[in-house]
Amino acid sequence: MSPVQGTQASGTNALIPRLLLMVFGLSLFFGSAARADSWSAGAVVTYDQVEWGESTTAAGMLLNASYDTVYGPTGDEFVIGSTTPGYFALFTDEVNLDDFIPASGAPGPLDANLSNPSTSSAGVYAGQVAALKLNLDFSNAGLLPNSSGLLLGNLVLTGFSGSESSLNGMTVDQFFGLSQAELAGQSTTIGFPDIDNLGANINAAFDAGQPDSFAQDHLVAPGSSAAMPELPTLLLAAVGVLAAAMFRKKRTLGRPNPI
């Protein structure tokens, strides 16, 4: 018997580290691309329900000064929840809305249609939905100026796992629709208290223009590279398969041939 030449096996040994090094470099590149999308101060502006409900804050003064500008086209009506199906809360001016937020109590759905209420069965959750609506509506009206030029409703949710993984790829506008349905008493994929916590996190994500950790980890601009973190993982998996195939080939090449 004579052994087969080992040059091909040696070439395989040299190739695998080079492939792994290439994948490592690509991982660094895509990781840097994601980090390059991190938010800076003033990029987006939001306020939480406490700020919207306090007349002496920047948000409260903005609400009192511009309520008619934003909601005048709808007859000054501010509605949270849903008229069909489910329940809603209707406010007809900023004074009544200001009396309602910030809301308190255990989060839950509405259990009746309400007009200018000061409290509701939905507890703190109704206040979160109201604050998110204010953030979205005032952003759309150009009354929450920012340095990015982005509308809050167009930002994309990302980085969630487990029971919240269905949120990945959803815009803030789409999440608000989910929040409205939950408030009205409709069944959704999130449920309480998670949807209440998420609403609170979005409202506080860019508090007065200052991005927090939730904004950095879970909100990206539309089309952002940060919303595509799986590519390095896929590359590693592909190289793993290739390496295994080459290893099997190397073992075959190293076997002695019968004379």
Question: What are the language-model segments listed below?
Answer:
Residues 3, 13, 30, 243-246:
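Coiled-coil-like amphipathic alpha-helices with heptad-repeat character
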Residues 3-20, 231:
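Bacterial N-terminal signal peptides that target proteins for export
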Residues 18-29:
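Bacterial N-terminal signal peptides
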Residues 32-36:
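Sec/Tat signal peptide C-region and signal peptidase I cleavage site
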Residues 37-226:
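Soluble extracellular-acting proteins and domains
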Residues 229-247:
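A short, hydrophobic C-terminal helix/tail in secreted or cell-surface proteins
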Residues 244-259:
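C-terminal membrane-anchoring or membrane-association module
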